[in-house]
Amino acid sequence: MAIKTYKPTTPSRRYMTNLDSGDITAKASVRALLKNLPRSAGRNSNGRITSRHREAGAKKLYRIIDFKRNKFGIEGTVATIEYDPYRNCRICLVNYVDGDRRYILQPKGLNVGDKIMSAESGLDIKTGNTMKLKNIPVGTLVHNIELSPGHGGQIARSAGGYAQIMGRDGKYVSLRLPSGEMRYVLGECLATIGTVGNEDFSNIVIGKAGRSRHLGIRPQTRGSAMNPIDHPHGGGEGKTNSGRHPVSPWGMPTKGYKTRKKKASDKLIISKRKK
């Protein structure tokens, strides 16, 4: 997908880039597959900020995506390719022969008019088809991978994302995840063949602060620019270092310090993710 640049009518617009929208074929979304999603803007149920530097952003409607892909044995045809304001990849509207319509993530190379299907086994290894991991050949690239059978895809769903099937061990299948982590997943879990499209999304330059605000991202203030009451790095006469290792506003080391808690699923990790 082509990267679009702009005429530098302002300093911020000089370096701003965006993706060409020529691949989008729909002028309007299906109303039955839209819903209003209340936005928390980083607040919890008490109204207190639990995730800093977040806001609501531009008003938008949520597209209901079929992550489960559980219409087994029913062929679907890609009707449209659409923009989704909640995602960095495109979505496809699939019309099934039984009259049902669902949105799915658009895999790279899947176009309008293509046929897709879900089944436990026996399908061609074709982009967009969904099968159980135990029935997909070793070396295949997959996305929208379940971690628990029937719970819907949770892994490799962002633009350009994929995991690779590395082998089988009993009831488990070993995967190399986008982070570089090697992990066992139950062979009964579903996965979709191919990689997620819109892989050039990571090359976009935001270009100006207002565009980040539309995305729901608020400015970040350096701790060294605060007062001592607000941050451990704050205070001092003029610009000064904090005299300690970098920490969060609550005093936790913030560069390279491991904070992951132990959990039962740790035994399924073969090798940890790469930094």
Curated annotation (Swiss-Prot):
Annotated Gene Ontology cellular component terms: large ribosomal subunit
GO biological process, one term: cytoplasmic translation
Keyword Ribonucleoprotein attributed: yes
Region span, Disordered: 218-275
Family matches, as InterPro entries: NA-bd_OB-fold (IPR012340), Rib_uL2_dom2 (IPR014722), Ribosomal_uL2 (IPR002171), Ribosomal_uL2_bac/org-type (IPR005880), Ribosomal_uL2_C (IPR022669), Ribosomal_uL2_CS (IPR022671), Ribosomal_uL2_dom3 (IPR014726), Ribosomal_uL2_RNA-bd_dom (IPR022666)
GO molecular function annotations of the record: rRNA binding; structural constituent of ribosome; transferase activity
Protein keywords: Ribonucleoprotein, Ribosomal protein, RNA-binding, rRNA-binding
Biased composition (Basic residues): 257-275
Its biological purpose: One of the primary rRNA binding proteins. Required for association of the 30S and 50S subunits to form the 70S ribosome, for tRNA binding and peptide bond formation. It has been suggested to have peptidyltransferase activity; this is somewhat controversial. Makes several contacts with the 16S rRNA in the 70S ribosome.
Assembly and binders: Part of the 50S ribosomal subunit. Forms a bridge to the 30S subunit in the 70S ribosome.
Protein family per UniProt: Belongs to the universal ribosomal protein uL2 family.
Protein name in the entry: Large ribosomal subunit protein uL2
Organism: Sulfurovum sp. (strain NBC37-1)
